[in-house]
Swiss-Prot record:
This is ATP synthase F(0) complex subunit 8. The chain crosses the membrane at residues 4-24. It is found in: Mitochondrion membrane. The lineage of its organism: Eukaryota, Metazoa, Chordata, Craniata, Vertebrata. The gene is mt-atp8. It comes from Dicentrarchus labrax. Keywords: ATP synthesis, CF(0), Hydrogen ion transport, Ion transport, Membrane, Mitochondrion, Transmembrane, Transmembrane helix, Transport.
Amino acid sequence: MPQLLPTPWFTIFIYAWMVLLAVIPLKILSYVYPNHNYLRGLQKPSEHSWFWPWS
């Protein structure tokens, strides 16, 4: 029974998982979230109040 011999399919299985575990974290870590906290420090908040002519 060839399915009981682990040599051919086990190495393919291990290599496939090694490739997936190497590629997927890179894809996840390269994803940029739009609402990071470090973006708040780049813009200086305005210090003047708004002018509302109707109030």
